Each structure stands twice: as structure tokens, then as C-alpha cells.
């Protein structure tokens, strides 16, 4: 298969990209040495390898702009704001993937499993890179990024009970997947660290060192505990009562002596939003014209980012809060683990952030009943959900 697009550069070699795959299977149970294994229903080894392309429709080889207006001499004039410079060298993103699997079934398909190994590597991913400002732009898109992933998955299916009127089936699935950003560029003015060498779901956070005697956060820097204001190295502004150093609150000018590079160095790897292990199991019961399904899903080794349950600079006595507010530091609760309150009015400013934590396995239970007899007219299917985190 040979696909082409006019969304890339003018050079014909960038317009087309071959898509191909090759696969094969070996039905081992049909071999002569297993001919007498009557109990074996299926034993098959599968392998595949191939390449496929992807088009990033957010980019273009042509100059892009948005229609706008401006004031010139007191009169409104139309203008075009250039949002993307022309780039004639963009090409397809390409992904190479391989897969190996073993299928097994026995005892009239009452017991079966699939064991699978897979890997993927995507190249020429379109990323943003910094270019000299003399060009009139500060960044452009280029085929530079690269990411890889690999994993293992196991699925077990059983028929536990099978009679004339009743059948009980179980399916269990568990998978482990890892991914890694092999190549990526970041702008010099980026506040976030590079993902290169980390998972695509990597989370970076500032490592805290508890609270001081006034309930204000402290941080680690170069192995030492330092105050929040000293940590970011500039004066506390009214719009940033703790001196948190949140980028949008930075006071540009002589008061600021912290750079984007400094901020990136403060951030440490906290974990990944991509779970290490996922899985679940499903039980399905059939009795005459009724069937009932009970399922559970889980994830392990995942970091979650959640918004704080309160804003220390914007609290309201008339607002409902969770019981976690009892853990907020105050002069009467010096054992509190959450930062103290610094304001109670909207005008006091804002000091929001994200909290990173390792959650309990996420479980979703649900029951499904359907295939009711035709003389039951109330409903044809009943779904009952119970979700717990």
C-alpha cells in the first residue's frame, strides 16, 4: 500500500509513504506430533511486523494566519496574524510495530488463554523547535520526535460450569506496558523539563520539605531546606502571596532572578500517569433466558494529579469544603499537614497548584442483566454500576 498527501512539503519524496505489514501463523496443534492430543483444541503461534504512517493535521507546509483587526490612526484596519511559518520539509510520521502471540484452547474450549508480546517505535514525530528570532518567528515544526513502547498481555478464559440450563464463564486479563520518549526538543523558555528518557505520561513536581512554624511550605534545594520565598528567589507579590513562583505570576524585571532553566532544575520526576499494570476480570452467568455479568477493572503503579481541595488564598467561610480541611495547618492545629490559609477574599489573589499522589487501584464494578423473556415488558436490559476509587 502506498499513500500520499498534499499536506506536506513540495518535494514528492515527502508526499508519499509506503504502508506495509507481514504476518504469519503456525497451527501447532495440527502437527503430526500432536495428532493424538484429542483434548487440545487450538495451539497457534502468531507473529507480525509492519509500518504505518500518520498525518499531523495541525501542521502545514504553507504559511498560516488568522484574520484579525487593529487600530491604525484611530480607524479599524484588517490584518492577518501569521500563526505558523511555511515549512516545505515536513514528512509523514512513521510507526513500526511487531507482535508475537500464543493462542491456546483445550477441553472443548472450556480452558483457553492468549499470551502476547508487542512493541512499537514511532519516528519522525512532528515536534516544535526554536529558530532564530531574526526569521520573524520563534519556533517551527519539524520531524524530530521519537517514542517507543513495549508490553506484555495475558488473557485467560474459562467455562467453569456448563449444564443444559446454566453456564458460568470467567475471563481474566492483565497487561504491563511501558513507553519511553527517545527524542524530543524543548524550547529554551520552557518551564517544563524535557520528557526525553521518560514516559510520555511523566509528571514532574517540586519536592516539598513540609511546613515551617507558620504553616508555609518549605522546599528542598541542593539538599537543604529553604523557605518558599528563598526557593524561587524573588519578592512576594500581592498576586502571589506565598511567592509560589507559578510562571503566570512571575514578576518580570529587576525583582526576578530565577530563569526558566532554574525552574526546570527544581522539578524532579514524580512518576507517570501511565499505569504500570492494567487488568480486570469478568464473570458471566447464564440461566435459561437470563444472563448476569459482574466485572472488575484495576490499574497499578499510576500517578494521579488532582486539583487541591482548597485555595489557600481564596477561602470562604460560607463555602462547603471536604473534611480534609481539618488537616490544614493553623495556630490551633499545628500538626496539620496542608499549608495554612493566607486569605479569604477573591482580591487576595490566587495560589493554585497541582498535587501528585499514588492512588489506590481504581475499581469499577458493574452488573448487567439482559435477554429477559418476551412476556416481561418492563425492560429488556438492566445495568447496575458501583464505582469505587
Regions found by a protein language model. Give the residues of each.
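Membrane-interface anchoring segments and C-terminal beta-barrel signals
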Residues: 39, 344-389
Amino acid at each position: 500500500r502506498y499513500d500520499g498527501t498534499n499536506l506536506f512539503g513540495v518535494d514528492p519524496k515527502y508526499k508519499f509513504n509506503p504502508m506495509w505489514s507481514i504476518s504469519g501463523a503456525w497451527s501447532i496443534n495440527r502437527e503430526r506430533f500432536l495428532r493424538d492430543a484429542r483434548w487440545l483444541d487450538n495451539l497457534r503461534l502468531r507473529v507480525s511486523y509492519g509500518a504505518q504512517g500518520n498525518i499531523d493535521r495541525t501542521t502545514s507546509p504553507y504559511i498560516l494566519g488568522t484574520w484579525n483587526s487593529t487600530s491604525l490612526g484611530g480607524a479599524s484596519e484588517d490584518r492577518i496574524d501569521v500563526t505558523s511559518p511555511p515549512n516545505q520539509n515536513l514528512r509523514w510520521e512513521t510507526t513500526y510495530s511487531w507482535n508475537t502471540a500464543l493462542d491456546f484452547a483445550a477441553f472443548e474450549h472450556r480452558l483457553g488463554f492468549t499470551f502476547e508480546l508487542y512493541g512499537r517505535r514511532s519516528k519522525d514525530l512532528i515536534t516544535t523547535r526554536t529558530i532564530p528570532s531574526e526569521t520573524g518567528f520563534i519556533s517551527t515544526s519539524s520531524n524530530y520526535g521519537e517514542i517507543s513502547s513495549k508490553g506484555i498481555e495475558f488473557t485467560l478464559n474459562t467455562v467453569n460450569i456448563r449444564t443444559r440450563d446454566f453456564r458460568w464463564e470467567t475471563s481474566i486479563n492483565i497487561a504491563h506496558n511501558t513507553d519511553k520518549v527517545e527524542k524530543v526538543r524543548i524550547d529554551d523558555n520552557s518551564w517544563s523539563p524535557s520528557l526525553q528518557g521518560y514516559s510520555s505520561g511523566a509528571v514532574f513536581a517540586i519536592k516539598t520539605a513540609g511546613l515551617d512554624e507558620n504553616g508555609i511550605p518549605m522546599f528542598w534545594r541542593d539538599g537543604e531546606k529553604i523557605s518558599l520565598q528563598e526557593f524561587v528567589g524573588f519578592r512576594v507579590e500581592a498576586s502571589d502571596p506565598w511567592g509560589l513562583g507559578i510562571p503566570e505570576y512571575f514578576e518580570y524585571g529587576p525583582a526576578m532572578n530565577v530563569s526558566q532553566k532554574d525552574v526546570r532544575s527544581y522539578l524532579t520526576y514524580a512518576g507517570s500517569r501511565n499505569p504500570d499494570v492494567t487488568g480486570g476480570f469478568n464473570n458471566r452467568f447464564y440461566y435459561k433466558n437470563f444472563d448476569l455479568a459482574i466485572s472488575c477493572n484495576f490499574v497499578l503503579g499510576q500517578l494521579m494529579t488532582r486539583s487541591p481541595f482548597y485555595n489557600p488564598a481564596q477561602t470562604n467561610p460560607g463555602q462547603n469544603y471536604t473534611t480534609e480541611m481539618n488537616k490544614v495547618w493553623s495556630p490551633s492545629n499545628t500538626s496539620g499537614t496542608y499549608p495554612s490559609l493566607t486569605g479569604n477574599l477573591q482580591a487576595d489573589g490566587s495560589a493554585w497548584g497541582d498535587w501528585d499522589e499514588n492512588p489506590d487501584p481504581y475499581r469499577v464494578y458493574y452488573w448487567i442483566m439482559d435477554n429477559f423473556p418476551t412476556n416481561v415488558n418492563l425492560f429488556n436490559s438492566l445495568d447496575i454500576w458501583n464505582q469505587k476509587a
